[in-house]
A protein has these predicted regions:
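Tubulin/FtsZ superfamily GTPase core signature
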Residues: 1-386
Length: 386
């Protein structure tokens, strides 16, 4: 008689390039559990500083461990050279996250290669990437768009973080390093929001099969994470999750929804109902809604809601700006939300249509007085490059 075994989903997070490895480091520092961390880079020195479980320096023959020089083609070739090693590292994974900062060399060129290998191995493959700040220059922005389109073909689901939106919810004293840390934090919340649905035992269980149902071959997806406290904590958390200033599009029209509500042991059925109702009202009437509830006494009197929306109609997607990851609309240590009287910063609302105004995507003035013709020459420190 065979001994019964408990089978847990194997989740691996691959950070590739400077931005991806930085994001992985932040996830490790934040105590993200239940996943294996893998750092991949052409910059051997930066790789040494990572606390990832597995480290792989790629492109040794091409770059001699000195980085890709912000050239995506070098990043792609470096990953291809080590295809067999990447495949060995990813074997056995049920889900693979590929995280990177788009616009540089290693992340932009190498992420599609890693994602392709993961899918060939049968893993549910999720891309979580950043679109660069405008102050990083037109060339980097152009490379990022090309990289995003290529990565989209290699993953099941792609979540994009628009870095310029981080400037809209920060103040003028935010340093460049703090801006990049904010981007890392959002990448972390993107991965944490999905893995928590799987690895945290639930009062109403959400398992890996549920996540696969919504995210397999889903294309672009939206994700929101919100927290609330007080009498209306669950509904407040739900509204925060779907109305973050970082959210570039509404979840309206989503035909696949993953909804997870976490709270203390005093979480009531009515609270759960109100939170779910606030979100499902915005979704497609025939949406496939998969729901989970988790009791986590560590939250105290707070409630946390995680929403993943996918399966948008192609026609609807064409009218949206590119989807993005949303984080809680509550103020945190590293991300400061705008004051109530700050009317210059647009905050999307569940109850009103988002205005399609190009000015929404313009960042706060950074480096005023800089010669615009030379913005491609902006020197980003090596450890921040992809």
């Amino acid at each position: 008689m065979q001994t019964p075994q408990n089978y847990l989903a194997v989740i691996k997070v691959v950070g590739i390039g400077g931005g991806g490895v930085n994001a992985v480091n932040r996830m490790i520092e934040s105590g993200l559990k239940g996943v294996e961390f893998i750092a991949v880079n052409t910059d051997a020195q930066a790789l040494l500083m990572s606390e990832a479980d597995v480290k792989l320096d790629i492109g040794r023959e091409t770059t001699r461990g000195l980085g890709s020089g912000a050239d995506p083609e070098i990043g792609r070739r470096a990953a291809e050279e080590h295809r067999a090693e990447i495949e060995e590292i990813l074997k056995g994974a049920d889900m693979v996250f590929v995280t990177a900062g788009e616009g540089g060399g290693t992340g932009t060129g190498g992420a599609p290669v890693v994602a392709q290998i993961a899918r060939e191995l049968g893993a549910l493959t999720i891309g979580v990437v950043t679109r660069p700040f405008s102050f990083e220059g037109r060339r980097r922005a152009s490379q990022a768009e090309e990289g995003i389109q290529e990565l989209k073909q290699s993953v099941d689901t792609l979540i994009i973080v628009p870095n310029d939106r981080l400037l809209q919810i920060s103040d003028e004293t935010t340093s460049m390093l703090d801006a990049f840390r904010m981007a890392d934090q959002v990448l972390h919340q993107g991965v944490d929001g999905i893995t928590a649905l799987i690895v945290t035992p639930g009062l109403i269980n959400l398992d890996f099969a549920d996540v696969r149902t919504v995210l397999s071959n889903a294309g672009s997806a939206l994700m929101g994470i919100g927290q609330g406290a007080g009498d209306d904590r669950a509904e407040e958390a739900a509204r925060a999750a779907i109305s973050s200033p970082l959210l570039e599009a509404s979840i309206e029209g989503a035909k696949g929804l993953l909804l997870s509500i976490s709270g203390g042991s005093d979480l009531t059925l009515h609270e759960v109902h109100r939170a779910a109702e606030a979100i499902t009202r915005a979704a497609h009437p025939e949406a496939n809604i998969i729901f989970g509830a988790v009791i986590d006494d560590a939250l105290g009197d707070e409630c946390r809601v995680t929403v993943i929306a996918a399966g948008f109609d192609r026609a609807a997607e064409a009218s949206f700006a590119r989807p993005a990851l949303a984080i809680s609309a509550r103020e945190s240590d590293s991300i400061r939300l705008p004051e109530d009287d700050d009317e210059d910063i647009p905050v999307p609302s569940l109850l009103k249509e988002r205005q399609e105004d190009e000015d929404l995507f313009q960042p706060a003035q950074v480096g005023a007085g800089r010669n615009d013709e030379g913005d491609d020459d902006l020197d980003i420190p090596d450890f921040l490059k992809g």
